[in-house]
């Protein structure tokens, strides 16, 4: 089954948008455009770029818009026009939204995953990542099959620096402050749907599929 829909997920860190995206990407042959994944890939390939933005990432701050905009736009240019995709983690600011509109990055539907702060902290404190392939796991929602090793390459799993409780709280505050005008814009466009991210991932996916 293939979809050509252009989809945006809006949700705080820990809302499940990355995991949900991967489920839909596999089922509907969509391209997953995660700013986090794009940055990690670029950092692993370009030491000069890594040095430039490492301070932002380690403190939980957003990278300057011009850097994020270029990274996302360069990636989208490589995607065929009839190919569906999921934007995950972009746009996060009004400046990024304006860049999207100006550069013709169009969307068919927007899903806003609403979740309580205490649930976010609980979920993120249980996140683990593979250092080699960047696959993510969650001890609450998506456990690795082999203890604390990656299912794909048996590499030891780690906790990211920005998943520490004090940084999580900072990330939640920044997200809440930046997301309101973006949500208001898409509300006026009539393409935004609100989802309860407190429910299971399976229940959330079933709701999303009603609009695909």
Swiss-Prot record:
Residues 126-163 are annotated as: LID. Its EC number is 2.7.4.3. Residues 34-63 are annotated as: NMP. It is found in: Cytoplasm. Zn(2+) binds at residues 130, 133, 150, 153. It holds the Pfam family ADK_lid. Pathway: Purine metabolism; AMP biosynthesis via salvage pathway; AMP from ADP: step 1/1. AMP binds at residues 35, 40, 61-63, 89-92, 96, 160, 171. SUPFAM superfamilies: Microbial and mitochondrial ADK, insert 'zinc finger' domain (SSF57774), P-loop containing nucleoside triphosphate hydrolases (SSF52540). GO terms for molecular function: adenylate kinase activity; ATP binding; zinc ion binding. Keywords: ATP-binding, Cytoplasm, Kinase, Metal-binding, Nucleotide biosynthesis, Nucleotide-binding, Transferase, Zinc. It catalyses: AMP + ATP = 2 ADP. Its main location: cytoplasm. InterPro entries: Adenyl_kin_sub, Adenylat/UMP-CMP_kin, Adenylat_kinase_CS, Adenylate_kinase_lid-dom, ADK_active_lid_dom_sf, P-loop_NTPase. It is an enzyme of class 2 (transferase). The keyword Ligase does not apply. Catalyzes the reversible transfer of the terminal phosphate group between ATP and AMP. Plays an important role in cellular energy homeostasis and in adenine nucleotide metabolism. Belongs to the adenylate kinase family. Consists of three domains, a large central CORE domain and two small peripheral domains, NMPbind and LID, which undergo movements during catalysis. The LID domain closes over the site of phosphoryl transfer upon ATP binding. Assembling and dissambling the active center during each catalytic cycle provides an effective means to prevent ATP hydrolysis. Some bacteria have evolved a zinc-coordinating structure that stabilizes the LID domain. NCBIfam families: adk. Monomer. This is Adenylate kinase.
